[in-house]
């Protein structure tokens, strides 16, 4: 609590000092720095707008100086990034796990169906232009399994009027290096974007007050990584009625997995291979005779090859087990939209995926095991808008089938449905209200049902789907220098899939009868003057499961009660800009290895600071030099028991943009 008080006093004093000593001035028109945080916006495009959509544009993304998506975690509403014992960085929104959330990159799913996860620490940032987040049960147009939210990541917009590019070099602690480049160009018919990066690091430094014989040095054991990424996109406008987009994403990585602290038999893992290659084709076409009837579509194919080497001990010399896996994934989605009257739209959607997972494990006799899953969703959605009211209702039929072995022996076939309904009412040009309800099912993944995770889990092929019943209501407002967003939410998750601790120091996934989650979210953004902007975000969350007595009293792991963040952006003078970020997390519980009961993680406050100076080399070329300190006070904190996070770290570098 003393740290929190110090943080609050510090930030208040900072605002007062800069307000008094550096009175705001109107910036010159050719200033290369934009000093306002304009991150929270409501999607006003004529697509389902029955829920507020929170957006993070490239200015916030650039100021994070990150190299991968996981470094943006605290910038997303009601979210936290958690690194698990496999070394994977995953996102949680409103306490919902990564398997309950779908991530899309330019409309193509990023989640790997084998476990419906994606390691965000391996997804590059250099081509990302905007991230938008829909919380709760989304539109049925997103297909299966998205029961708690959708994160849409879009690549940077191509300016067809000129060629543009950016080159970045960054350096940091533990011999961390990052180099990236991006170039785009074209004309009104054909345009392109190419981006690539290479990053390497020997690991991260632990906070100064951490001490444990399992990690005797200040550098985290086995925390290094190396990654090369390449993204390309071509846009073709073949007529006034249609466009075609082709993109590729290649990620070639190697990473180490820090072993858990104070665990009898931790994982001594390394990934000598993690390679993902994807090709996607998407487009839209407006039909003749009407400008309101169109089809949007995307199809993609992805190949993922990963290997885990398990070592005997912390010397990382002798390999005693390994797992090699290959995934082939096909995704598809088509949405037909038609205006059936001057005030209503009708949409038809078909979306789904087909995946094949092959794995070979040394301890299981090097026998190739094959798993197949096919999921499809057929949906219909009706949107009505009249004057200040917009409503939406949708239903879908969802199906999942799982087959095991080369002969596709059917293991199970599950059918279910999803339904959503929502309303948004604009009180005037500045204020609006919204409410929504929904039901949606998530099918168990192949890994949840059949994988032992190299001896860490006991498989449970009898897992049932989990079904979410959700509702939320909100109030939004805006003024000429900012806006706010207040939302209340409630979710009942039936047969929720959670893990339990077993006596033999293993885990098993089971279905909980009912999990209840409720809370509130508040976002407030304000540009105080042309020099100072701030963004405040606060989430209160209560998540409990029903016990045998029928009372909501059982604790759940890694669902923090309080999450809050503050961003303050200040321009001292032309081209000199600073940003301070404060993150606060409180009252979170987790299972420790071999202990059947939950234990509370320590609360923490993290403060980060950035300073950047931009030089205009010409009318079209700018150079920025920056420095950044993360976790200024070197705070020891955990997002999962046994896995301490990084202490104070430094990074700096330069970027050239033209």
Where are these regions (language model features)?
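Outer-membrane beta-barrel signature, preferentially recognizing the C-terminal barrel domain
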Residues: 263-286, 325, 409-413, 418-422, ...
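Short, acidic, small-residue-rich periplasmic hinge/interaction motif at the N-terminus
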Residues: 27-62, 98
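Gram-negative outer-membrane beta-barrel transporters
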Residues: 385-390, 489-492, 511-592, 633
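Short acidic/polar hinge/loop motifs at secondary-structure boundaries
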Residues: 108-136
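Periplasmic-side early beta-strands and strand-to-turn transitions of outer-membrane beta-barrels
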Residues: 160-162, 186-272
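C-terminal beta-signal and adjacent terminal beta-strands/loops
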Residues: 204-207, 441, 492-494, 585-591, ...
């Amino acid at each position: 609590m003393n740290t929190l008080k110090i943080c609050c006093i510090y930030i208040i004093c900072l605002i007062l000092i800069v307000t008094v000593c550096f009175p705001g001035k109107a910036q010159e028109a050719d200033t290369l720095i934009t000093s306002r945080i304009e991150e929270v916006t409501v999607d006003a495009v004529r697509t389902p707008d029955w829920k507020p959509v929170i957006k993070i544009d490239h200015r916030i993304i650039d100021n994070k100086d990150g190299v991968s998506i996981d470094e943006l975690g605290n910038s997303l509403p009601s979210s936290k990034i958690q690194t698990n014992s496999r070394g994977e960085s995953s996102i949680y929104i409103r306490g919902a796990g990564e398997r309950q959330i779908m991530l899309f990159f330019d409309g193509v799913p990023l989640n790997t169906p084998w476990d419906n996860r994606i390691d965000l620490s391996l997804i590059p940032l250099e081509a990302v232009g905007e991230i938008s987040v829909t919380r709760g049960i989304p539109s049925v147009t997103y297909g299966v399994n998205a029961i708690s939210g959708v994160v849409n990541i879009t690549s940077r917009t191509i300016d067809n009027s000129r060629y543009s590019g950016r080159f970045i070099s960054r350096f940091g602690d533990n011999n961390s290096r990052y180099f990236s480049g991006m170039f785009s160009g074209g004309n009104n018919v054909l345009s392109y974007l190419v981006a690539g990066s290479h990053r390497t690091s020997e690991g991260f430094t632990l906070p100064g007050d951490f001490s444990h014989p399992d990690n005797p040095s200040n550098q985290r054991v086995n925390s290094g990584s190396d990654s090369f990424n390449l993204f390309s996109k071509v846009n073709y406008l073949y007529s006034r009625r249609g466009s075609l987009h082709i993109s590729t994403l290649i990620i070639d990585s190697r990473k180490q997995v820090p072993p858990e602290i104070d665990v009898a038999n931790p994982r001594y893992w390394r990934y000598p291979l993690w390679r993902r290659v994807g090709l996607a084709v998407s487009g839209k076409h407006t039909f003749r005779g009407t400008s309101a009837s169109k089809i949007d579509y995307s199809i993609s194919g992805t190949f993922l090859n990963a290997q885990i080497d398990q070592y005997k001990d912390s010397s990382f010399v002798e390999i005693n087990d390994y797992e090699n896996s290959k995934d082939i994934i096909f995704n598809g989605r088509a949405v037909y939209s038609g205006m059936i009257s001057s005030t209503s739209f009708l949409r038809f959607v078909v979306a789904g995926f087909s995946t094949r997972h092959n794995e070979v494990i040394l301890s299981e006799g090097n026998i190739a095991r094959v798993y197949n899953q096919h999921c499809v969703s057929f949906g219909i959605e009706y949107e009505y808008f009249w004057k200040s009211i917009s409503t939406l209702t949708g239903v879908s039929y969802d199906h999942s089938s799982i087959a095991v072995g080369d002969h596709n022996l059917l293991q199970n076939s599950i059918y279910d449905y999803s339904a959503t309904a929502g309303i948004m009412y604009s009180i005037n040009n500045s204020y609006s209200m919204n409410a929504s309800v929904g039901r949606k099912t998530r099918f168990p993944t192949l890994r949840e049902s059949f994988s032992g995770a190299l001896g860490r889990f006991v498989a449970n092929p009898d897992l049932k789907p989990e079904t979410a019943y959700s509702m939320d209501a909100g109030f939004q407002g805006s003024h000429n220098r900012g806006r706010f967003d207040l939302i209340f939410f409630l979710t009942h998750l039936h047969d929720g899939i959670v893990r339990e601790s077993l006596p033999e120091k293993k885990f098993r996934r089971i279905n909980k009868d009912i999990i209840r989650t409720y809370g509130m979210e508040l976002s407030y953004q304000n540009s105080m003057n042309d020099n100072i902007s701030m963004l405040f975000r606060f989430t209160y969350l209560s998540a409990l499961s029903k016990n045998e007595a029928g009372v909501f009293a059982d604790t759940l792991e890694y669902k923090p009660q309080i999450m809050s963040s503050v961003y303050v952006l200040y321009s001292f003078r032309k081209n000199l800009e600073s940003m301070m970020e404060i993150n606060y997390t409180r009252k979170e519980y987790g299972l420790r290895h071999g202990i059947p009961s939950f234990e509370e993680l320590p609360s923490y406050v993290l403060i980060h600071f950035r300073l950047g100076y931009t030089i205009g080399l010409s009318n079209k070329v700018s150079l920025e030099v920056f420095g950044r300190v993360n976790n200024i006070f070197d705070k020891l904190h955990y997002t999962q028991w046994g896995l301490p996070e990084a202490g104070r770290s430094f990074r700096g570098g330069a970027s050239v943009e033209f």
